[in-house]
Amino acid sequence: MGLSISEIRKNTTRARHLMQRTRAQRFAVGAFNIDNQETLIAVARAAQKLQSPVLVEVSDAEVKAMGLENVRDLVDNYKAEYGIEMYLNLDHGPTVEGCKRAIDAGYEFIHIDISQANHNASDEEIIAKTREVVEYAKFTGALVESEPHYFGGSSNVHTEDINYEEIKKTFSTPEGARAFVEATGIDTFAAAIGNLHGKYPVPKVLDLDLLADIREAIHCQISLHGGSGTPLHYFEDAVKIGVSKININSDMRYAFRTTLEKTLRENPNEYAIVKLMPPVYVAVQEVVESKIKAFNSVRKAVV
């Protein structure tokens, strides 16, 4: 069941107020990727328990698996059931058309990432297509996020170490961030400061001095992608500097899979899926709760 334009605009207005609160109250909202209804429930339970605002997000693969509008309906249903402040983000949308469909479906947050589909996309193409989404989003008030180039990793569990000499080549710069924000009019800039998609065998190292310089250079919100596997103290410091949104995916997937595998080993004769899920809910919820606490968003929800 689709939302009316008045309902969508009401939601995006509340989403904008949330992002303003992150700056004023020095917290970040967690953006938690969901792969299915079970992970959505885990996020909702964590948000309710800690009275925290949350974003749930889906990328292209999840959209294809679950359906753009189906995800919208699920989020609205659980938001109402749990009485929580929860919004929906399209994560790493690779096409203008896909982003427009999400805007029409009432997604409050849109991440347009042209370089996701084409790592060699030109600056001109990235700016033009990002600007097109920004203009389209004005009809509903959806907040648009983007970045000027692709940065590496994948939302998986990796066995290789992190090559920071290579990663540094993709770091954001204050000058580049300012130029991109001014050229596109985005609401949120996705900074690259050592954050990397995926979970690695070594902890990630974030350049907080660079983050502070970027914060000084731009007026809009700042997000950090690739939050999984990052020592929590980095998040605590990033929030103080002024990061408003932090993405988490691989840590949740790892908790889901490893807990499910353990549960299956311990219950070899159980075939009722709903009876196998309770430990999985708990494991994923614990991951979400730990991030919420590090992001300083406990008791920051406005319902």
What residue spans do the PLM features occupy?
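Glycine-rich beta-strand-to-loop/alpha-helix junction loops that act as flexible
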Residues: E147, H225-S228
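Charge-dense, low-complexity intrinsically disordered segments
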Residues: R9, N120, P201, P278, ...
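C-terminal alpha-helical cap/extension of soluble enzyme domains
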Residues: G2-I5, P231-V303
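Active-site-adjacent C-terminal substructures of enzyme catalytic domains
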Residues: P203-V205, L210, A217-C220, N269, ...
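Alpha/beta enzyme core
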Residues: T13-R21, N36-E62, L68-G83, Y87, ...
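N-terminal amphipathic alpha-helix/helix-capping segment at the start of soluble metabolic enzymes
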Residues: M1-G30
